[in-house]
Amino acid sequence: MSSLHKSRIADFQDVLKEPSIVLEKLRELSFSGIPCEGGLRCLCWKILLNYLPLERASWTSILAKQRGLYSQFLREMIIQPGIAKANMGVFREDVTFEDHPLNPNPDSRWNTYFKDNEVLLQIDKDVRRLCPDISFFQRATEYPCLLILDPQNEFETLRKRVEQTTLKSQTVARNRSGVTNMSSPHKNSAPSALNEYEVLPNGCEAHWEVVERILFIYAKLNPGIAYVQGMNEIVGPLYYTFATDPNSEWKEHAEADTFFCFTNLMAEIRDNFIKSLDDSQCGITYKMEKVYSTLKDKDVELYLKLQEQSIKPQFFAFRWLTLLLSQEFLLPDVIRIWDSLFADGNRFDFLLLVCCAMLILIREQLLEGDFTVNMRLLQDYPITDVCQILQKAKELQDSK
């Protein structure tokens, strides 16, 4: 470890040990990258994402309150309607007479359960493929959710819900005449999503299953947006960072902490995921056009070239902006970019500058290339040095 790196760690420690943390100092340090040693990044992100307040004295009580609240969400939302949950005040006889799976009432708990399953299956499909370049999300967590997995309780795991729902959809088929046929899943040669990764034994769960639970609870609490494909790519780096914290106490509560940080982050970017807002000033279309207007201001020659080739920002910037560049770089580089994004007071204005910098840094290739070549460049970005990109974005910011 270089003396410069040791000095940076000491600077962070000095800022973080103050009874009242000075946010501007923390932002200034974090913008240039947060050391991963000693759990510094995890702590800084929790402050920068407004999960932890600046007053250190209140951390213990707030963490206890929020983690307790998350446990309550688990109790309330990961249950199967129609099964007695004595410790939640739901008894079998109450459910049997008032509700049943064929109840047509839209407010029926069974109707809600089936709709939730549709959302759950989409989440399940997406989280199984999270960060395929590393094995982390397929490995077992050291801290499985005992509230869900303990055989002494009556909670149903999301894993079982997915298995049961998928099994029914695979084995029951209706032909064009409307006749329902039962088929054995063993005769189906198509690979099942459930078999894509080895299923862990009872009492264990993979990291992707934890992410699945976070997203499912978020969808339940936010029915207006629920779950949109791509949210998994936002929560993934957050959870990875918190679940690899060297401090076991922090790591044990990675799920709850990730949920609240993800919720706070989504409060800032959720408009990107709402299609009805695409063309509004807070929507994704406006932001994509802002990338091009910024490029026009900084490099008009390159802007005109892209316009001439009819390369619209929707062709590449939609993914860049919506997913906070999480699909353009390897996970460690994404995390480094997010250090700067989270630290910047106008963080998503800075994201626009990062996107603009990415274009300018490959300007020579773009000016020489035709439509096909340039689309390939933009959809499979060639530069891997994210520090170079961030430096260029900072130059653009300072030159305003």
Curated annotation (Swiss-Prot):
GO terms for biological process: intracellular protein transport. Residues 35-345 form the Rab-GAP TBC domain. Expressed in adipocytes. Its main location: membrane. Keywords: Cytoplasm, GTPase activation, Membrane. The keyword Plastid does not apply. GO terms for cellular component: cytosol; membrane. PROSITE patterns: TBC_RABGAP. GO terms for molecular function: GTPase activator activity; small GTPase binding. It is found in: Membrane; Cytoplasm. The keyword Cytoplasm applies. Interacts with RAB1A and RAB10; in a GTP-dependent manner. Acts as a GTPase-activating protein for RAB35. Together with RAB35 may be involved in regulation of insulin-induced glucose transporter SLC2A4/GLUT4 translocation to the plasma membrane in adipocytes. This is TBC1 domain family member 13. It comes from Mus musculus.
